[in-house]
Amino acid sequence: MRRYISHLFTWVISFLTLLAFSSCLNEHPKEQLDGDGSNGSASEIFDTTIAPLYDFMGGTIDGEGIRDIQRLDSLLSLSPDDEQLYSSWQYLYRAIGMCNKSLDMIDLQSVRLTDNQKAQFKAEVRAIRAMMYYEAMDLYGRIPVLLSSAESLIYEPASGSSVTDEKLSAQSERSEILHFIFSELQQVLPYLPQTSSLEEGSHYGRITQPVVNFLLAKLALNAEIYMYNDWAQGYRKRPKGRDLEFMVRTADGASLITGGKASENRSKILNAWETCIFYCNRLADEGCSLEEDEIFNSSVRYLMPEDALLMDEADSVQHPRPAKPLFHFRYADVLLMKAEAMERNDGDGRAEYNMVRAHAGLPARKSSLANILEDRQVMLAGETCHRQDLIRFGKFLKSSHLRRSVQSALTSCSIVFPIPQRSLAFNGKLVQNKGYEAME
């Protein structure tokens, strides 16, 4: 049966019964977002509600973020008791909780904002939150969903129970999380600035339309994986990209969250590969291109704030940390994604593939899937997509990049990480991912 994975209301009834205030973290977001934004201008409200969220993007400090556990050598430890797994889980859900707090604060200060300012502020926060959910879904598979207070009230009638009480949240299937993330990104896209986040100015380093288009392309490229909920059985029976349908908005359309419907001339149904190609083309239309300076090949870069402090454990003195760009989203990745999607959709990805090779000083060659994977492993070595690529290509469990001791310990269950044991102990509604139960 063909599935329409971008239509929010086909998902909401089955999904919302699982939504409750999550147990995933025991820090209150107010600890990170000081004050309530009750005084000052729109600029000051932005500084209180949105600017702090970018501190969580990248996770470059040791033991924080998701970059460390994305490395293949980290697979040597897959125990639910692994401290890094818990730190990454906590990091992601702390950021999600902060986003929800920010949304509540923006709602509280609506009188100080124009309608456009409110829509733009909330869109930026929801885009950051969607990115965090994307990372959590990719790592842990079945995860809980947290919403802001206002969103919870909207969904409460559909769920038949309160989603803002103190009950701890259960998990949702990975396919449901994909529905949610894709819909969120589609809805916020028209309200974000069209400029590149690398351009100097007020949007420098922030989430803009090119960043969201990149994420939508990435979600579509991996839809075969994310739509298959029984990964412990391997991926031979996973759905086919040609059979997964996305309702793609070719213009702004109306927001489904408010009950609107995009008109027929503003949307069309595409399969997963066509959807990936569509959003890659959007990035080209927005002026993205390969540049001589690698820094300009990014849709966005995560920056360590210049005034960030680093604790030296030897002398307990804080030292300034220099700003360091991390190139998470690069246009070379966009071209390789498009080439792969075209090949998987029985098309010809040679033009895009060889643009990347020419930029790297390499001769042209056939754009086979094997060649594309090989070049992704080399050209995107600094990104966190290597593990994801191997899973998508069906090479993860037999990768030559893994040590034999790691290979022998991996099973189909290893495609996602275990739910951290400390999170399971805190929230009795969480269930361990299949294959890891014996390790608890």
Residue ranges with predicted function:
Residues 130, 217-218, 323-359:
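Extended amphipathic alpha-helical segments enriched in small hydrophobics
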Residues 68-140, 164-204, 313-326, 331, ...:
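Conserved, well-structured interaction surfaces
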Residues 1-33:
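Bacterial Sec-dependent N-terminal signal peptides
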